[in-house]
Amino acid sequence: MSERLRVQIPGLDLKNPIMPASGCFAFGIEYAELYDISKLGAIMIKAATKEARFGNPTPRVAETSSGMLNAIGLQNPGVDEIISNQLKKLEKYDVPIIANVAGSDIEDYVYVANKISKSPNVKALELNISCPNVKHGGIQFGTDPNVARNLTEKVKAVSSVPVYVKLSPNVTDIVAMAKAVETGGADGLTMINTLVGIVLDRKTGKPIIANTTGGLSGPAIRPVAIRMVYQVAQAVNIPIIGMGGVMDEWDVIDFISAGASAVAVGTANFTDPFVCPKIIDSLELALDKLGVNHILDLKGRAFR
């Protein structure tokens, strides 16, 4: 892989800045049957909680214009099973793992972070304080700066690897949230998570999602995501992994231009399971067209 795409941020030596977003790539093993996942910059695996979660009732997914709504509810087999099974299977691949950590209270987050950060192939944690689809935990931690800072401090104290905090767009001031978790010791940020929305059944007029609301993702949210990255990148001194509606290499360049250091691809994996390697293969040609040598030469050019 060309050095033109290599990116180094806390805990992560990325051969390229492209990674699948948590919740859109399962645990990566499934995609390993389709292509060499070692080609990816990193893998953000599905959220881990202290105990197994069965998620929200169905229906949990609805298609929207230029996107989708989901309310999966952090379904996962629990941190112990993830460590002994899914993470174990990923050890043979040359790709750093970012483990997504979720919980119902601070004690849950601390428990999961302490355990999963000790796994040899986990190089960073993604602290999920912004999931809008669970009744307890998630978004309640992601909308109060003081609560978010406190949680970040507690997780940092027990984590063996750098901690990236996933920010919610469902706030009035995302810069305040970013500064709060930076003060709490966050090594980096991932942003943005989904926007809260509702899709109605045209015949009944009732919400399609059993949970009523869900998280909106896909190209529809990309301008919002880029705006928020643009704002936060100028306010903090820690790196950002940008995400929100990325479909191709030019979307990646937009996020880098807005101030991100790396980019995660989410919903696009459902429409094209090969989207990540396709983007990686196209990035250098895009750099050539722009007349730049390295991907990070574009970082923050929107406000420089």
Swiss-Prot record:
GO cellular component: cytoplasm
GO molecular function: dihydroorotate dehydrogenase (NAD+) activity; dihydroorotate dehydrogenase activity
Cofactor: FMN
UniProt: FMN binding residues: 22, 46-47, 100, 128, 166, 192, 218, 244-245, 266-267
Protein location: Cytoplasm
Cofactor binding notes: Binds 1 FMN per subunit.
Alphabetical UniProt keywords: Cytoplasm, Flavoprotein, FMN, NAD, Oxidoreductase, Pyrimidine biosynthesis
One BP term from GO: 'de novo' pyrimidine nucleobase biosynthetic process
Transmembrane segment boundaries: none
Pfam families: DHO_dh (PF01180)
E.C. code: 1.3.1.14
Active site: 131
Binding site for substrate: 46, 70-74, 128, 193-194
Family: Belongs to the dihydroorotate dehydrogenase family. Type 1 subfamily.
Known partners and oligomeric status: Heterotetramer of 2 PyrK and 2 PyrD type B subunits.
PANTHER family per the UniProt record, alphabetical: DIHYDROOROTATE DEHYDROGENASE (FUMARATE), DIHYDROOROTATE DEHYDROGENASE (QUINONE), MITOCHONDRIAL-RELATED
The protein's role, per its UniProt record: Catalyzes the conversion of dihydroorotate to orotate with NAD(+) as electron acceptor.
HAMAP family assigned to the protein according to its UniProt record, in alphabetical order: DHO_dh_type1 (MF_00224)
Protein name: Dihydroorotate dehydrogenase B (NAD(+)), catalytic subunit
